[in-house]
Amino acid sequence: MEEMSPDNIHGVILAVSSSIFIGSSFIIKKKGLKKAGVSGARAGEGGYGYLYEPWWWAGMITMIVGEIANFAAYAFAPAILVTPLGALSIIFSAVLAHFILEEKLHMFGILGCVLCVVGSTTIVLHAPHEQGIESVKQVWHLATEPGFLAYSAVVLVVVLALIFYYEPRYGKTHMIVYVGICSLMGSLTVMSVKAVAIAIKLTFSGMNQFKYFHAWIFIIVVTICCILQINYLNKALDNFNTAVISPVYYVMFTTFTILASMIMFKDWASQSGLQIATELCGFVTILSGTFLLHKTKDMGNSTSLRGSTSHSPRDTPVFINSGSSRSSNSTRPAIL
């Protein structure tokens, strides 16, 4: 295990702070979506009534604060270090959902969260140091190499297929559609965010990077990707259980982001086989935790559902493949 550099330490502190804010924002935003769904069309049905709900905006502000901290973290540390710390937002979100939204988290779900943290910690302790980048043009060169251009093209094709073919047909019954869109676009967002963060960092150090058009192209990419992510994340939150959206979104987002970072920044080029293997083991541990959360998803809800007839069918979590559990929603008021 290598000693962490000062930049990596700064990145970790910012990433942890970001996870706390973002984890809270999931819960606050969902409260807003619940309130908006009572009086109008739900976000999952194409409604935008949540834009008039103060709770939703409070959640957005909380998320923005978290994203700013996350944004700053990418200026100091590699994506393979910053991104896995999103596991902390899973735990914070799941615990708050248990107490505030009454989306019950079983003891095996708690174990799944612990595994996510252990895996993330393993990755952090063996993460590579940030490579020296002295200009946004250097990042642009990395982004326009054939490998990353091919990755970006594949992402765009898959996202367009999900939006125009799969989302209208399977969006409300298969969480993977919404989460897939957010995760794939998120990997491009992170690469562009890192470029912009580096440009800002270098500009504050006296080397203005915004005189180059490359920086502005990265800003445009970030804006477009963020708008898409917010829209489809709202639909996911409105249709499915928060305690499971968070870990599944985290795993998919982290997987694609690490893959994108490997291709673009070649994070593992300077590491030994043992270090890479240890990081992969950490990631497998995270996947195991998420699998455990998914497989035990109904345990925390079955008792309360049997004991009460006042719950809406929408209180029962619906996950990646759940085509038969939404049919009753069209015959009753839209209440989360």
From Swiss-Prot:
Its membrane topology is listed as: Multi-pass membrane protein
- What residues form the membrane-spanning segments? 8-28, 56-76, 80-100, 105-125, 146-166, 180-200, 213-233, 245-265, 273-293
Extract the InterPro entries matched here.
Answer: Mg_trans_NIPA
In the record, biological process GO terms are: magnesium ion transport
Q: Which residues form a coiled coil?
A: none
Enumerate the GO terms in the molecular function aspect: magnesium ion transmembrane transporter activity
Localization terms from the record: Cell membrane; Early endosome
Keyword field: Cell membrane, Endosome, Ion transport, Magnesium, Membrane, Transmembrane, Transmembrane helix, Transport
Bias (Low complexity): 321-330
Protein family (similarity comment): Belongs to the NIPA (TC 2.A.7) family.
What function does this protein fulfil? Acts as a Mg(2+) transporter. Can also transport other divalent cations such as Fe(2+), Sr(2+), Ba(2+), Mn(2+) and Co(2+) but to a much less extent than Mg(2+).
Q: What protein name applies here?
A: Probable magnesium transporter NIPA2
Which source organism does the UniProt entry give?
Arabidopsis thaliana
